[in-house]
């Protein structure tokens, strides 16, 4: 009962944020440079409707600014939000440290885990977070239109859902059409956020994918994808390409980005060389994206060493033919 069914990450983030008892002057901490836009819009919408303050903290050379966020906390901070892995350049966030800092002032932590669940072994209790949203179309190997919202039971019990439907109401033994005007009892925990009807096709795909991931073991999955990412980052660096974050380290998960973060459009970079490399990769049959000015190569559990070698070989060919 700590998990609600959603359509996507955006719905999960909004359901949680809009259900908090905001007062004018409360604040939320966010690092816009590292967030997907959908974990930015909702806070400015609440600033407009509830009078809250959105405290934007600059990134620390592409990394989550843990120390700066800690310094920005005060007694009016209600939420610290963060990606488990940034939208771009795809670095790991020290979620546990931020959650611990937030607790010191009584603030809640909300995590956008779109880029990590299904690739990185995750234990929400070990992290000490209060809420986490994820969708199934990325590392959970499933479909668009299905997702999960985790809310720690003690937190969920204090929230009044902004949207209510019969799936989120505790009817006990009564028929689903039963309604008593003086009684509105929410389902326990995060179940109060369920709206229904569910995306049953998405649920079927997610159930199968979760069984597969559990069978492989998430520690094994993480070791596999992160090992391949390390090999890719090292190989591209040896070719002289500007790999975000430099040599593999604690920042690296399963995403390797090439180029300089910032600027660019959703499907193009400011640097013509990066656009050229992107086109070369696509022509070589390599699937990747451009986000915030960098080429983002995301490694899945299905990838193998041969895939990494293919990317490195394609990059080498591009350098030789384009003279970069």
Q: Model-flagged regions — what are they?
A:
Residues 1-324:
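Pyridoxal 5′-phosphate
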